[in-house]
């Protein structure tokens, strides 16, 4: 999982949004699972496990609690993008699921955010997911 590539539109990088460190790691773990250079629909569900977060530096004893809390907050979070002289506000995710006994959450990205995190061909930033574990803050 740590050797996965994360690709995001520069518009997302420059956008106005607030995510905690754990929320950011959940989003990036899910983005890393999006097939590169392929069309993705908003029907796709991506899973993030306790092990995924532990690999990114979340403490083992609190990983599931942190994951669950982060996903609950992420469900309420939005991102504001400046597109063609319009400020557009959209949600990160449209659905979340919990599988408590397996330590896994599932999320479905919102239809509006998908063009900025999947099949991005121009004006993007990419980095290895393993670099995320070195982040001390949310950005």
Q: Where on the chain are the PLM-derived regions?
A:
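Charged, alpha-helix-forming regions
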Residues: 1-139
């Amino acid at each position: 999982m740590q050797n996965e590539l994360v690709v995001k539109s520069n518009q997302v990088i420059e956008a106005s949004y607030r995510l905690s460190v754990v929320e950011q790691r959940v989003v990036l773990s899910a983005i890393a699972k999006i097939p590169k250079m392929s069309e993705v629909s908003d029907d796709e569900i991506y899973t993030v496990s306790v092990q995924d977060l532990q690999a990114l530096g979340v403490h083992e004893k609190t990983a599931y609690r942190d994951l669950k809390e982060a996903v609950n907050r992420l469900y309420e979070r939005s991102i504001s993008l400046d597109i063609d002289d319009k400020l557009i506000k959209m949600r990160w995710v449209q659905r979340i699921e919990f599988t408590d006994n397996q330590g896994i959450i599932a999320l479905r990205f919102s239809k509006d955010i998908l063009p900025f995190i999947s099949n991005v061909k121009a004006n993007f930033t990419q980095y290895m997911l393993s670099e995320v574990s070195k982040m001390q803050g949310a950005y």
